[in-house]
Amino acid sequence: MVNTYLMFGRYSSNALKTASAARTRKAEHIVGRFRGQIKGMYAMLGGNDLLMIVDLPGIEEAIKVYAGLTKLTGITFTSYPAISVTELDRLMQEVANI
């Protein structure tokens, strides 16, 4: 089973200074090392600077990716598990008669 995580990042000033395509490739490698796949990566304005949508096997891999990315980049991440609305609909059907 694959789990989707939304990883919101906030850059420190040093993390922003060291941003580069090479660092992005290293970040992609960290996700892959823990059997994950990046579904999307977006720069943002506002309270968060970065959004990564990542598929990972489980919470242990999500924690390892979080720690690895933070160590590599200096970016502080807040991660949330997510499910599709289709999956939510299926779950709600299972509890419809409760």
PLM regions: where:
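Alpha-helix boundary/interfacial micro-motifs
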Residues: 20, 27, 52, 63-66, ...
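Generic structural signal for residues in well-ordered beta-strands
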Residues: 38-41, 77-79
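Short S/T/G/P-rich N-terminal loop/turn motif that feeds into the first structured element of a domain
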Residues: 1-33, 37, 45-48, 89-98
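Short, well-ordered beta-strand segments in beta-rich or mixed alpha/beta enzyme
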Residues: 5-10, 42-67
